[in-house]
Regions:
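Compositionally biased low-complexity segments enriched in polar/charged residues
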Residues: 11-12, 27-31, 51, 105, ...
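Catalytic Zn2+-binding segment of zinc metalloproteases
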Residues: 118-134, 159, 166
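Post-HEXXH active-site segment of zinc metalloproteases
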Residues: 109, 125-153
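Long, well-structured alpha-helical subdomains associated
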Residues: 144-157, 162-239
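Amphipathic alpha-helical recognition patches that constitute DNA-binding helices
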Residues: 106, 110-111, 155, 159
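Active-site scaffold of zinc-dependent metalloenzymes
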Residues: 62-109, 119-126
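Zn2+-dependent metallopeptidase catalytic core
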Residues: 23-49
Length: 239
């Protein structure tokens, strides 16, 4: 079923997060079945924008927690169907869960960041008339490492993750850009974050071409991270 026109540029990180936090009284420290938890959270997300929400099981999810994933489907978008899907991953052993406040805050931030990440992909594909882009050609011998590098080194992912990282850094450092620049050159960041994951994937090589592109993009996105959205206008994302 075709979707109505929607201006994706109106969504900001803080507004999505605040909207999700309206569920605190329904979710935080409430003993809910996994089905009930998903229904409450999923229905709320669907009211934000024309977004699909799916529940999945993942054995890496801790008890009383939810991991968030996302996907943009360019073929659905070209057919004017809902093209962004948010995946909510639950622990298979949680028949019931009682999510503490800090877990729900973390989940809400992840949902907000994932939605904006997928909107960036939407804009990328629309502006180039839905043409696919190539993955990065990794030279790693290990299959798992090669796949990770191929994915994270893709120009589309560098662009989208750069905004996510800029938001993480803004949360941590505010507008102290010198501190951010220093952090980006840190050999081994201590705090677990997307930037650290990139560094690990590319063998902690700050001069790797992918890392150089990533750092350049992060710095470009810092002013937009303060605004809470990755665009200054609604070109390609108002329909």
């Amino acid at each position: 079923m075709p979707i109505k026109k929607f201006d994706w540029s109106t969504l900001t990180r803080l507004e999505i997060y605040d909207y999700l936090q309206l569920l605190q009284k329904n979710i935080v420290n409430k003993r809910l079945t996994a089905d009930a938890h998903y229904k409450i959270l999923g229905n709320h997300i669907r009211k934000i924008a024309p977004i699909r929400v799916e529940r999945k099981i993942n054995y890496n999810v801790g008890r009383n927690n939810v991991i968030v994933g996302g996907q943009y489907n360019s073929e659905w978008d070209e057919e004017n169907k809902k093209a962004i899907t948010i995946f909510l991953y639950y622990c298979p052993f949680d028949k019931h869960l009682k999510m503490p406040a800090e877990n729900f805050v973390f989940t809400s931030k992840n949902i907000s960041d994932t939605i904006l990440h997928e909107i960036i992909h939407m804009r990328q594909y629309r502006r180039r008339n839905f043409e696919y882009t190539k993955d990065y050609k990794s030279k790693e011998e290990q299959d798992h490492k090669r796949k990770e590098q191929s994915y994270l080194g893709c120009k589309d992912e560098i662009d989208a993750f750069s905004f996510n990282i800029a938001c993480e850094l803004y949360d941590r450092f505010g507008n102290r850009h010198k501190s951010i620049a220093k952090y980006l050159e840190c050999k081994r960041p201590k705090k677990h974050c997307i930037y650290k994951y990139y560094l690990n994937t590319f063998n902690n090589d700050h001069n790797h071409p992918v890392m150089l592109q990533l750092k350049k993009k992060i710095k470009m996105y810092l002013p937009l991270a303060e605004m809470g959205k990755p665009f200054k206008n609604n070109n390609w994302i108002w329909y």
